[in-house]
Curated annotation (Swiss-Prot):
GO CC, any one term: cytosol
PROSITE patterns on file: KARI_C, KARI_N
Coiled coil: none
Residues annotated for Mg(2+) 2 binding in this entry: 192, 228, 232
Active site: 109
Reaction(s) catalysed by this chain's protein: (2R)-2,3-dihydroxy-3-methylbutanoate + NADP(+) = (2S)-2-acetolactate + NADPH + H(+); (2R,3R)-2,3-dihydroxy-3-methylpentanoate + NADP(+) = (S)-2-ethyl-2-hydroxy-3-oxobutanoate + NADPH + H(+)
KARI N-terminal Rossmann domain residues: 3-183
Cofactor note (record): Binds 2 magnesium ions per subunit.
Lineage of the organism: Bacteria, Bacillati, Actinomycetota, Actinomycetes, Mycobacteriales
Protein name: Ketol-acid reductoisomerase (NADP(+))
Keywords assigned: Amino-acid biosynthesis, Branched-chain amino acid biosynthesis, Magnesium, Metal-binding, NADP, Oxidoreductase
Pfam families in UniProt: KARI_C, KARI_N
InterPro entries: 6-PGluconate_DH-like_C_sf, KARI, KARI_C, KARI_N, KARI_prok, NAD(P)-bd_dom_sf
Length: 337
């Protein structure tokens, strides 16, 4: 099914310019949205809790900062860009008491709305504007006169103005320069979670660790295994990112290409596909989100245990030692990287 696309000519920037926008959060996406909205002539304030380390940075960049409750009270469009697991409490404590008829509540990801963790009043527009790139790229492209493609979706539209407002917002952060894709909260949420779990984070991580274990258990040096299954992955991913799988296969040696065709299906086979389908079902039926919420309510104990076990894997020890030799690699912000 073909997607519906919009560009700058389809967007009316004056719509968002006539509104007051509160951006809750000043992380990767929050800073990009806030600065680009401001540069597009939009009234914007940033909402941060008292004592936030991001407050000074936002103020240094010329933005007005107040508590989430105060900016929600001031604004008529509220973009909630805090972490997924913090959004429900922020909504309940700071946003919901300050919502008025005709306000709009926007998100950068659909999880909390799609799975019913946040339920906005019926007289509030609920929408999503989600750039398909990290915040630093969104901001850099905007400054360069370009843009990162965005997704927009409307879940609740009491006045019938939601799509025009979302499209205007997307244009204000540069998205309509590249292209805006219309989707739904369901589609964005479920595809995003599946991609993260089965391929980008979970799947790739386990593939790397298992490859490392197979080589080391066969008697190869951990350093050699690290280079072959982790370090060189960036070279392959960059080629795929730039031109797709065909570009990657064109660029590698015939030996690598031929071996990949023969062995890839032995690693990822019909049984793997079945398990991936099971992962998708767990996402669709809410099982994953229930476990996510239980983890948060339990003080993040399950996440911390998984994080600790992952950090202690031998590939992390080997990797840190080797990366210390690589002057061109940016130093990590975590103790284990």
């Amino acid at each position: 099914m073909a997607v519906e696309m919009f560009y700058d000519d389809d967007a009316d920037l004056s719509i968002i310019q006539g509104r007051k926008v509160a951006v809750i959060g000043y992380g990767s996406q929050g800073h990009a949205h806030s600065l680009s909205l401001r540069d597009s002539g939009v009234q914007v304030k940033v909402g941060l809790k008292e004592g936030s380390k991001s407050r000074e940075k936002a103020e240094e960049q010329g933005l007005e900062v107040d508590t989430p409750a105060e900016v929600a009270k001031w604004a008529d469009v509220i973009m909630l860009l805090a972490p997924d697991t913090a959004q429900a409490s922020i909504f309940t404590n700071d946003i919901e008491p300050n919502l008025e008829d005709g306000n709009a509540l926007f998100f950068g990801h659909g999880l909390n709305i799609h799975f019913g963790l946040i339920k906005a009043p019926e007289n509030v527009t609920v929408g999503m504007v989600a750039p398909k790139g990290p915040g630093h790229l969104v901001r850099r492209q905007f400054v360069d006169g370009k843009g990162v493609p965005c997704l927009i979706a409307i879940d609740q539209d009491p006045k019938g103005e939601g799509q025009a407002l979302a499209l205007s917002y997307a244009a204000a952060i540069g998205g309509a320069r590249a292209g805006v894709i219309k989707t739904t909260f369901k589609e964005e949420t479920e595809t995003d979670l599946f991609g993260e779990q089965a391929v980008l984070c979970g799947g790739t991580e386990e593939l790397i660790k298992t490859g490392f274990e197979v080589m080391v258990e066969a008697g190869y040096a951990p350093e050699m295994a690290y280079f072959e299954v982790l370090h060189e992955l960036k070279l392959i991913v960059d080629l795929i990112y730039e031109g797709g799988i065909a570009r990657m296969n064109y660029s590698v040696s015939d030996t690598a290409e031929f071996g990949g065709y023969l062995s890839g299906p032995r690693v990822i086979d019909a049984d793997t596909k079945k398990r991936m389908q099971d992962i998708l079902k767990d996402i669709q039926d809410g099982s994953f989100v229930k476990r996510l919420v239980a983890n948060v309510e339990g003080g993040n104990k399950e996440l911390e245990a998984l994080r600790k076990a992952n950090a202690e894997h031998p590939i992390e020890v080997t990797g840190k030692k080797l990366r210390d030799l690589m002057s061109w690699v940016d130093r990590p912000i975590t103790e284990t990287a």
